[in-house]
């Protein structure tokens, strides 16, 4: 099988999602925190290595204090978030949503973006979905790439990770998908679920990819 770095899928689409240009001199905010089980600090480290390579102007913040100041948030071109099962204050949520609405991009992977704040439906509306289950936990499954400018040149692949089952907005543009089988829950056999999507929230671009239960998945050859 031809070797293929999975993280290329994530980071290439991050870059293209930003402004369809390279990241050199663009301002990027990386926010990590929440549940330690998703290794958010490791995710932030992998992203930092990529941002250094891309010559981006970046800042990394541990915790939701990153969203305290709206005037600071709107200075960024892109926010990359890895925060799972945390609680965001009303003001922090308002600042984040307003910043993206005004044109700041937001991107992330797995529960770090789509299971961040379970009580906050306005946040979920912005992102485009919410995790609800991962039948079978860590399993092998196929990822099918769909035709899109962001996936040009990318091939279908298999991965061992959590296969996310989500409630998602029909308005998202799905660019990669997976199909469930009947081994765990027979009633979801052949259900097709997004693996990655893009959408707009006001002027802001949103990108999500569901792989990445362990951030090292992005560094593994398949």
How would you name each of these model-derived features?
Residues 70-71, 206, 218:
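C-terminal catalytic histidine-bearing segment of alpha/beta-hydrolase fold enzymes
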Residues 18-21, 68-71, 163-165, 196-197:
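Short, flexible, glycine/charge-rich loop motifs used to bind or transfer phosphoryl groups or to couple energy/partner
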Residues 1-23:
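Bacterial Sec-dependent N-terminal signal peptides
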Residues 86-153:
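A glycine-rich, often tryptophan-bearing local segment used as a flexible ligand/cofactor-contacting loop or short
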Residues 21-31, 35-114:
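Helical hinge/lid and interdomain linker segments adjacent to catalytic or ligand-binding clefts
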Residues 213-222:
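A short acidic/glycine-rich loop-to-helix N-cap element
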Residues 51-54, 75, 129-208:
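Catalytic beta-strand/loop cores that center a nucleophilic Ser/Cys/Thr
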Residues 40, 89, 116-119, 186, ...:
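Alpha-helix N-cap/helix-start motif
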